[in-house]
Amino acid sequence: MKIALFIAAFIGVASLLAQDAALPAPPDTVGVPYYLDSAASQLKKLPTEPYKKHDPVPGVITVTQTVNIKGSASAFRVPAENKIVFVYDATTMPRLYKFTVNGSNRKFSYGKVSVRGSTPIEGLPISVSRYKDTAYQISADQPLAPGEYAIVLADRIFTFGVDGK
């Protein structure tokens, strides 16, 4: 019985180590998310795009803060999967937003401002876990539907699109 437990534990540890060895090395760039292409065992750098913030002056009413990016779609495309994973090395917690596409522009809301102050809009729920060494991986808590998305790290916005199956 003890031998069977030892063998089962050894196989479990060996399979975990083998999975970790199959993963690509962590990124060498801080503050930039990478798409984990598990089929190719590669990390692919997400592009950043110029954006325009709309920060209205607080008044009597509550106003929404938005980010606008020109172009109806990101050039970086990923296939729809149950779990889309991104890897990053940064001290800032990333946020994930889904764009609303209107013609040749993409937009998402990130906060609400009123005379009483501002309230952030958190974006889509994500899970963060250790990747390798000092890197982390993030994934949405729910599968991402086809569409346009942004990962916000500090004051930089990285874009990607999810294509249908």
Give residue spans per PLM region.
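Sec/Tat signal peptide C-region and signal peptidase I cleavage site
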Residues: 14-18
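A glycine-anchored, Pro-Gly-centered beta-turn/N-cap motif
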Residues: 134, 140, 144-148
